[in-house]
C-alpha cells in the first residue's frame, strides 16, 4: 500500500489520503506523540474509521521500532543505579523508577465504541489495511462468547454471568478448563485479528471457552476492541482486569459520551428490591435450619455461615426501615436530597466504607448459591435482588471519601413513590413478625409506609472521565461524525484537550436539498409547539404536506415525529379524515413498533416495499431506534421529514435536576451550558441524529425537509450540524410550499440523471443483523446472504427480542471508490457508521423517557444557544435492510471547505505525587530525545559533583521550562539535593518573572 509521511510518521494508506483524511490523521498522531487528548469530528463518509486505525497503528509500529533501541539504553542506564553517595532517598528512588522505565513499554491502543457490531465493522476495516498483521483482540460478554450448552441457554445476562462463575469456581466447565492447554494452539494464536465470530469458531473447534481464551490475548495485543461500558464502568473494568496505564484510549461514536459517563456512575434501588432480598435471605436461612438440605443446594459446601445470614438480614431490615422513613411530601413529583443522603441512609443499616467489600463478596456468594438451588427447585429466584444491592453498594462506595466534595456537587438523590405490588401468597410483614425466619412484605402495608425508589443520579460526566484519566492513560481521543459544539462538550467532560478538529462533509451542494417548510399546502402554519399539538387544522396541514411530498420523493421517505403520543395523535386524525389512505396510495406506510418482537418483520417488509416503484414511507420518532440506530443509505431513504422539535419532558425530575446542576455550576471560565441552553440543545441533537439517517456516504443524495417554522430562527439554525447549516444560508427563511414542490421535483430529476445509482451489491443487500436477548449485550453478528433475485433471509440466534444493527451498512472502502472521485477536492471511504444503542450498563439506572408527553411537558424555542451537536441513545425499535437498484452516473463537483481548529482549553495541572506518575507524565509530554537526555542527566547528577548539577539544570529547564510542563518543573524541586535547592529556587524564580 502507498506510504504517506504524516506528522513525521510513515503511514500506510490504501491510496493517497484526501485533505480531510490527512488533516484527521495529523491530529491523531499529534495527540499520540505529545501524550495529549483530542476531540475530532469527521462526518460519515470521510473515512474516519480507516484514518483512525491507520494513523494510530502507524505510530504504534514506529514506537515499537524505537523501543527496541530504547530498551537497550534503559537497561544500560539501570546499571548506573547500583550505588554512590548523595541525592537523598527521593532522588535515589526516582532514579530507580527511571531504571524501570522499560516496563512501561510501547503504549497499547484501546478502541472503544458503543456496540459490538461497530467494533466488528472496525475490525473488518483493519483486516483490509497494511496493519492487519498487528495483534488485536476483542473483548465480548459471556452472552456473546459462551459456548457451554447449559449456561448459554440461561435467560438474562446476569443469570449467565452467575452460572458461568459458579461452574468456573467449581471447576465443572470443561470449556474453561481447556483454555490453559489450548491457548497456544496455532488456530488460536495464528490469526492476528479475530472478531467475535472468529473467537466462537475457534472455541468450538478446539472445545475451548472463547470468553476466557480472549483474555489470554490481551497482554500481547497491540490494539484491544471493547464496548464503552467495559472501559467507563468501574465494575466492568475491574471484572475484566483492564489495565489502562500508558494506553491510548479511542472513544469512537462519542457523541453520546456524556450520557454514558453519567449513567455509569448512577444507580437505583427500590423498596421491593430490599424486600425481596430479605425474603431470599430468609429462604436460605430456612434451608440452613432445615434437616433436609436437599431442598436448597444439597450437600454443596457453603461459603458463608448462618451468622453471616443473620447479620445481613438485620442490615437489610434496617435498610428497609430507613427507606420507609424517607419523607416524600409530594408523591407525584418525588423528593430531592443532597448526595450525602445516600451515605446517611446506608449508614443507618451499617453499610460503610469499612465493610462494603465484605458485604459485596457475601452477596455474590449468595447469588451463586441460589443459582445452584434454583436448578433443583425451579420456583426459587436466582438472586437478582442481591445483584441489585451489590450494584448499589459498588457504585455508591466507588467514590472514595477523599472526593466527597465532588460527589456532593455532582450527584443528587431523588426519591420517588414506587407503585405497590402485592407479593404472591400470604406474607406477614417483616417488622411485625420480627423473627429471623420472618418474611418481608413488599408493600409494608402494616406500617403505613409507601414503597419508594431511591435514585442516586450523577449529573457530571466529567466525574467518570476523571476516573479514567486517573488511571494514567497516555491519550484519550474522542471522535464521531458529530461532536460539535466542541467547547461545551470539553467543558462537561472536564478533560485537558490539546487537539481539536471539525472536518467538513464530503458531499457537495448538488447532492442535498434542505428547506424549512413553515406552512402547509393550505397555508396553515406548521409549528409543533405545545399549544398547537391539539389543533386539528395543524394536524391536517401536516398530513397534506406529507401527502404532497410523498408524490415527489422516489423510493424511501422517512418521517420523524417529536414523540410517540404525537405520532399516534396524527395517525388517528389522518385515518379518520382519509388522509392516511391518500398517503398510503402513494407509498405504503410503516410505523415504528414500540415492541421489539415486531420490529424485524416491520423493517423487512419496509425494505421489500422499497423495491416497488412506489417506494415506501416509514413514520418513526426522534430518539427511537430508527432515528438512532439505522442506516437508510441510497434508495432506502431519499428524503427525511422532521415534523417538530423533540424537547425533553419539561417536568421530568431528571431533566429538572440536570438544568439545576448546570445553572449552579456554570461559570464564565468553565463554559458550561446554561440549563435552558442544554434543554434546547437536547432537542436539536435528536434532530441531527434523525437527519443523519439519509446522507450516508459520498455518493448518496437526498432531501431534508424541516416542517416547523421554528427552524428558521437563527439561534436554532446554529444548533444544526455544520454541514446542514451550509445549505440553509446566512438568513434562512421559511419557503412557500409551491416553489418547494417545483424545486423538489427538479432536484430528484437532476439527481437521478447525474448521480450513479447503486447496484444491489452496494446498497440494500445484504442485511447484517444482530439478535440479542432483552437488556443483554449484543450477540455476534452474522452476514445474511442473499441469492441473486431472491429476498434477504434473516438468521436469528435467539428467539426472545431482536436488536438490528448495521442495517444497510455502507460497503467497505475500496481504492477504486476513491479513484473515481479524482476531480474532487475531498474524498473518503464510505466508513461504516452503524448506529445503535449501547446495551445498558451493569448498573440499574433510571433513564429519562424523552418521548413522554403530557399536559405538564411543554416546550418553547426561547433561549436557544448558538451551537449544534448530535444526540445519544434512547427508546424502542431498530432495523434492518434489504436491496437496492438502478444505475447512476457521476457528476463530480469540487468541494473546498475550511477545516476549523478550535483553540485549546486550558486546564490547570497538578504535580503527580508518586515518582512513577511523575516520570510517566514527563515522558508523555516531551519528545523521546528530550526524555532520554533528562534521564541521563538525572542518573549522572545522582552520583556526580557540582558540575553535574549544572548539567542537570540545563537539561531540566530546557525540557520542562515550557508552559505545558511548568508544573513538573516546580515539582522537580522535591528531587534536588538539599544543598542545591536554593540555587534551583533562584533559577525557578527568574524563569517565572521572564
Swiss-Prot record:
[4Fe-4S] cluster binds at residues 146, 164, 173, 209. A probable ATP-dependent DNA helicase implicated in DNA repair and the maintenance of genomic stability. Acts as an anti-recombinase to counteract toxic recombination and limit crossover during meiosis. Regulates meiotic recombination and crossover homeostasis by physically dissociating strand invasion events and thereby promotes noncrossover repair by meiotic synthesis dependent strand annealing (SDSA) as well as disassembly of D loop recombination intermediates. The keyword GTP-binding does not apply. NCBIfam families: rad3 (TIGR00604). One of its GO terms (cellular component) is nucleus. The keyword Hydrolase applies. It is found in: Nucleus. One of its GO terms (molecular function) is DNA polymerase binding. It is an enzyme of class 5 (isomerase). Residues 7-316 form the Helicase ATP-binding domain. Residues 874-884 have a biased composition (Low complexity). It comes from Drosophila ananassae (Fruit fly). GO terms for biological process: DNA recombination; DNA repair; DNA replication; male germ-line stem cell population maintenance; negative regulation of DNA recombination; negative regulation of t-circle formation; regulation of double-strand break repair via homologous recombination; telomeric loop disassembly. This is Regulator of telomere elongation helicase 1 homolog. Residues 861-887 are annotated as: Disordered. A motif (DEAH box) lies at residues 252-255. CDD domains: DEAHc_FancJ, HN_RTEL1, SF2_C_XPD. Pfam families: ARCH_RTEL1 (PF23109), DEAD_2 (PF06733), Helicase_C_2 (PF13307). ATP binds at residues 42-49. Belongs to the helicase family. RAD3/XPD subfamily. It catalyses: ATP + H2O = ADP + phosphate + H(+). Keywords: 4Fe-4S, ATP-binding, DNA damage, DNA repair, DNA-binding, Helicase, Hydrolase, Iron, Iron-sulfur, Isomerase, Metal-binding, Nucleotide-binding, Nucleus. It comes from the Eukaryota. Its EC number is 5.6.2.-.
Amino acid at each position: 500500500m502507498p506510504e504517506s509521511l504524516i506528522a513525521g510518521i510513515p503511514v500506510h494508506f490504501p491510496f493517497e489520503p484526501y485533505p480531510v483524511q490527512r488533516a484527521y490523521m495529523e491530529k491523531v498522531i499529534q495527540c499520540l506523540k505529545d501524550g495529549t487528548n483530542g476531540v475530532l469530528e469527521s462526518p460519515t463518509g470521510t473515512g474516519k474509521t480507516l484514518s483512525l486505525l491507520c494513523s494510530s497503528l502507524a505510530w504504534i509500529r514506529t514506537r515499537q521500532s524505537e523501543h527496541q533501541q530504547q530498551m537497550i539504553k534503559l537497561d544500560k542506564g539501570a546499571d548506573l543505579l547500583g550505588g554512590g553517595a548523595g541525592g537523598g532517598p527521593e532522588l535515589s528512588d526516582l532514579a530507580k523508577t527511571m531504571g524501570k522505565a522499560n516496563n512501561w513499554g510501547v503504549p497499547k491502543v484501546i478502541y472503544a465504541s458503543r456496540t459490538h457490531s461497530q467494533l466488528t465493522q472496525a475490525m473488518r476495516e483493519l483486516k483490509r489495511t497494511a496493519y492487519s498483521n498487528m495483534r488485536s483482540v476483542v473483548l465480548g460478554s459471556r452472552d456473546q462468547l459462551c459456548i457451554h450448552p447449559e449456561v448459554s441457554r440461561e435467560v438474562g445476562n446476569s443469570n449467565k454471568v452467575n452460572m458461568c462463575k459458579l461452574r468456573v469456581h467449581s471447576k465443572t466447565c470443561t470449556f474453561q478448563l481447556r483454555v490453559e492447554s489450548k491457548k497456544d494452539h496455532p488456530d488460536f494464536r495464528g490469526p492476528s485479528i479475530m472478531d467475535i465470530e472468529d473467537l466462537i469458531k475457534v472455541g468450538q473447534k478446539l472445545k475451548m471457552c472463547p470468553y476466557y481464551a480472549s483474555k489470554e490475548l490481551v497482554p500481547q495485543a497491540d490494539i484491544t476492541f471493547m464496548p464503552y461500558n467495559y472501559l467507563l464502568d468501574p465494575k466492568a473494568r475491574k471484572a475484566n482486569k483492564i489495565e489502562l496505564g500508558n494506553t491510548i484510549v479511542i472513544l469512537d461514536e462519542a457523541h453520546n459520551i456524556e450520557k454514558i459517563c453519567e449513567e455509569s456512575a448512577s444507580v437505583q434501588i427500590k423498596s421491593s428490591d430490599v424486600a425481596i432480598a430479605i425474603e431470599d435471605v430468609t429462604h436460605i436461612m430456612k434451608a440452613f435450619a432445615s434437616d433436609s438440605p436437599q431442598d436448597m443446594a444439597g450437600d454443596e459446601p457453603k461459603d458463608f455461615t448462618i451468622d453471616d445470614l443473620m447479620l445481613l438480614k438485620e442490615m437489610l431490615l434496617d435498610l428497609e426501615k430507613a427507606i420507609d422513613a424517607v419523607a416524600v411530601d409530594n408523591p407525584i413529583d418525588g423528593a430531592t436530597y443532597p448526595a450525602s443522603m445516600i451515605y446517611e441512609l446506608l449508614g443507618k443499616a451499617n453499610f460503610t466504607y469499612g465493610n462494603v467489600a465484605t458485604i459485596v463478596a457475601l452477596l455474590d456468594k449468595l447469588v451463586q448459591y441460589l443459582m445452584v438451588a434454583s436448578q433443583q427447585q425451579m420456583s426459587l429466584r436466582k438472586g437478582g435482588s442481591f445483584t441489585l444491592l451489590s450494584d448499589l453498594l459498588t457504585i455508591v462506595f466507588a467514590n472514595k471519601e477523599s472526593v466527597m466534595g465532588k460527589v456532593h456537587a455532582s450527584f443528587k438523590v431523588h426519591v420517588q413513590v414506587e407503585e405497590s405490588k402485592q407479593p404472591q401468597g400470604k406474607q406477614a410483614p417483616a417488622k411485625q413478625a420480627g423473627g429471623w425466619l420472618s418474611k418481608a412484605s413488599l408493600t409494608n402495608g402494616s406500617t403505613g409506609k409507601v414503597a419508594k425508589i431511591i435514585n442516586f443520579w450523577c449529573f457530571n460526566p466529567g466525574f467518570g472521565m476523571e476516573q479514567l484519566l486517573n488511571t494514567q492513560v497516555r491519550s484519550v481521543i474522542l471522535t464521531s461524525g458529530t461532536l460539535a459544539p466542541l467547547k461545551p462538550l470539553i467543558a462537561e467532560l472536564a478533560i485537558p484537550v490539546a487537539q481539536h478538529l471539525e472536518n467538513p462533509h464530503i458531499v457537495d451542494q448538488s447532492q442535498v436539498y434542505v428547506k424549512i417548510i413553515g406552512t402547509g399546502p393550505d397555508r396553515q402554519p406548521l409549528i409543533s409547539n405545545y399549544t398547537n399539538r391539539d389543533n386539528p387544522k395543524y394536524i391536517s396541514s401536516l398530513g397534506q404536506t406529507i401527502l404532497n411530498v410523498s408524490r415527489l420523493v422516489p423510493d424511501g421517505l422517512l418521517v420523524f415525529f417529536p414523540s410517540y403520543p404525537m405520532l399516534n395523535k396524527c395517525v388517528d386524525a389522518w385515518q379518520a379524515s382519509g388522509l392516511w389512505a391518500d398517503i398510503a396510495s402513494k407509498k405504503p406506510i410503516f410505523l415504528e413498533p414500540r415492541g421489539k418482537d415486531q420490529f424485524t418483520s416491520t423493517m423487512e417488509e419496509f425494505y421489500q416495499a422499497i423495491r416497488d416503484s412506489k417506494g415506501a414511507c416509514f413514520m418513526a420518532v426522534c430518539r427511537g431506534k430508527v432515528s438512532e440506530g439505522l442506516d437508510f443509505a441510497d434508495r432506502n431513504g431519499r428524503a427525511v421529514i422532521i415534523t417538530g422539535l423533540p424537547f425533553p419532558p419539561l417536568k421530568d425530575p431528571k431533566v429538572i435536576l440536570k438544568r439545576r446542576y448546570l445553572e449552579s455550576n456554570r461559570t464564565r471560565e468553565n463554559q458550561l451550558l446554561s440549563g435552558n441552553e442544554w434543554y434546547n440543545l437536547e432537542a436539536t441533537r435528536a434532530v441531527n441524529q434523525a437527519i443523519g439517517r439519509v446522507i450516508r456516504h459520498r455518493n448518496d443524495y437526498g432531501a431534508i425537509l424541516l416542517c416547523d417554522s421554528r427552524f428558521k430562527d437563527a439561534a436554532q439554525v446554529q444548533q444544526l450540524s455544520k454541514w446542514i447549516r451550509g445549505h440553509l444560508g446566512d438568513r434562512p427563511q421559511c419557503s412557500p410550499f409551491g416553489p418547494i414542490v417545483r424545486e423538489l421535483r427538479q432536484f430528484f430529476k437532476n439527481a437521478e440523471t447525474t448521480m450513479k445509482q447503486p447496484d444491489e451489491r452496494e446498497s440494500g443487500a445484504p442485511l447484517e443483523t444482530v439478535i440479542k436477548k432483552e437488556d443483554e449485550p449484543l450477540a455476534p453478528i452474522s452476514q445474511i446472504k442473499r441469492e441473486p433475485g431472491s429476498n434477504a433471509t434473516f438468521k436469528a440466534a435467539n428467539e426472545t427480542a431482536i436488536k438490528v444493527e448495521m442495517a444497510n451498512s455502507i460497503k467497505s472502502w475500496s481504492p477504486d471508490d476513491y479513484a473515481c472521485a479524482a476531480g474532487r477536492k475531498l474524498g473518503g471511504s464510505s466508513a461504516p457508521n452503524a448506529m445503535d444503542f449501547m446495551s445498558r450498563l451493569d448498573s440499574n439506572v433510571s433513564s429519562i423517557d424523552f418521548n413522554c408527553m403530557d399536559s405538564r411537558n411543554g416546550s418553547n424555542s426561547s433561549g436557544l444557544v448558538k451551537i449544534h451537536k448530535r444526540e445519544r441513545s434512547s427508546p424502542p425499535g431498530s432495523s434492518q435492510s434489504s436491496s437496492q437498484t438502478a444505475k447512476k452516473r457521476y457528476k463530480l463537483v469540487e468541494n473546498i471547505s475550511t477545516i476549523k481548529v478550535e483553540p485549546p482549553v486550558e486546564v490547570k495541572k497538578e504535580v503527580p505525587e508518586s515518582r512513577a506518575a511523575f516520570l510517566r507524565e514527563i515522558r508523555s509530554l516531551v519528545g523521546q530525545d528530550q526524555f532520554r537526555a533528562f534521564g541521563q542527566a538525572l542518573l549522572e547528577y545522582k552520583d556526580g559533583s557540582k558540575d553535574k548539577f549544572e548539567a542537570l539544570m540545563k537539561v531540566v529547564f530546557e525540557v520542562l521550562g515550557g508552559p505545558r510542563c511548568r508544573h513538573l518543573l516546580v515539582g522537580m524541586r522535591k528531587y534536588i539535593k538539599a544543598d542545591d535547592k536554593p540555587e534551583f529556587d533562584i533559577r525557578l524564580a527568574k524563569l517565572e518573572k521572564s
